[in-house]
């Protein structure tokens, strides 16, 4: 009886031991590469093991493929196990085909069957088809690594990880990333990079966790996805197959599994040995033979590009083209490049235009290391002789006087000259005399300006190496600096004379109202400048233009009108009403009378500029004369011939004028409308 009982106990013990051993065999497995694993795996479709490395390839970058690799034996979970549990760790790689977008991805699969003959590739990942997707009879759980955004499955992007239950519409998904334990935040990871990626899938206590990381990173502390799932509801018979599925469509890639570890228990899961994992092949782009047509098209494209670039070069060359001759080398320090002036004036922008006169337009600009400038574009008459023209421009730039607008240099291109001068911040005098939007100048300011211009003219006539005739003195050519000092500018018709030279003049130049009567017969001289300065004195004191056709005829000619006022013993009536009576009567009357002396139609009766300075500074008394004196108050040359041979004893006697034919220098700085 005792022996029978002992025999029964031993039988039960050996049966239980056999059961435990079989359970341990089914508890898990590990593949560090798949070189010896073919007998334990079920492969179908495009799936195969690449020898000798033992790399498991699911697809080979061909279109419309699917491949499956499952552990052959199902794992049975007995009914006494209240909850299913498992853990797996695998390393995969999705390698793009050179020159193609990859697709569609890899899925780790838990299924009640390994028969996927009815499944479709492409977005169905070789797991389902349009009929079975979402069907209650589909006993399937998949962790998808999806590299294509499928709108029909509401994919979030083309680089995401998702949990799929009976359908490719993920119940949980997130863009591929991993939690960095070092940085304490998620870091993105690209699935279709060709690099090995680690995936952990842990299911325990009805909680499914999916964790992702690059090969070089240990398992992160936090999973990417976490979802409560009851697998018993999905797999009521509790018999489960574990494996992988991958698919391509028109989008293709190489999809590999490098190593795989599986266990029923997370605590018993074996670690993969990365040193034993196979290498990932990276295909090189095929060097396709270039067709002759493509070569011709490329050559044609190159020729077109060269033509376009050549056109741009020629356009820019023409745009910035300048005329340079050998003789100009000696003047190079005074020459500016057209490109620098083009940029300085913001391409001669109209908003920067300061004025427009008879000789050209003036623009404001700014040059580095120079500052604010005024640039006048002058159309040059080639008949005048360019070499002499440039020489006189440069010589004009050498004139140094505090009451001259400094000429900084020039630029020459084709029939155009650009003259560069210092910018005068307060513009021209005529704006303050005739434009009501400008404030009226006080008498003291006007007198200072007249003295400044007289000083500048005296310098031009006697202070330079050569006599310089300005030939266009008027209010619009008198510039005002920041302190309202007068500066004589616009040498648009200026010319040089050697002392004692005498050459006939062939044409009269100047501005109507400022031109001396003898210009038509005797040409220019220093006395023609004195005449114009006399008109300027009347203009500044009266606040009127020398000729104004809009007013009654008896007041139309400024010189005659001032003389008429004097003749009526009311010369103060000619004074600018904008002064509001705030002026010295003695000074204003002196300036008006001096203006009449300077505008005497008998040139020899006009004072020199040196004498004008003495008079205007009241260092000398004015000559004794009256409105009826010969040549006084005559604004037209009608009486010129009858009085020219006479001599006025009431005005200083001046030596005979000389007139010369010289290059006229077109240097104009006009800030108002030229007249």
From Swiss-Prot:
The lineage of its organism: Eukaryota, Viridiplantae, Streptophyta, Embryophyta, Tracheophyta. It is an enzyme of class 2 (transferase). Residues 348-620 form the Protein kinase domain. Its main location: membrane. Residues 23-292 are extracellular. The active site is at 472 (proton acceptor). CDD domains: lectin_legume_LecRK_Arcelin_ConA (cd06899), STKc_IRAK (cd14066). It is found in: Cell membrane. Residues 1-22 form the signal peptide. Residues 314-675 are cytoplasmic. GO terms for cellular component: plasma membrane; plasmodesma. It is a single-pass type I membrane protein. One of its GO terms (molecular function) is protein serine/threonine kinase activity. In the C-terminal section; belongs to the protein kinase superfamily. Ser/Thr protein kinase family. It comes from Arabidopsis thaliana (Mouse-ear cress). ATP binds at residues 354-362, 376. This is Putative L-type lectin-domain containing receptor kinase I.11. Residues 27-263 are annotated as: Legume-lectin like. It catalyses: L-seryl-[protein] + ATP = O-phospho-L-seryl-[protein] + ADP + H(+); L-threonyl-[protein] + ATP = O-phospho-L-threonyl-[protein] + ADP + H(+).
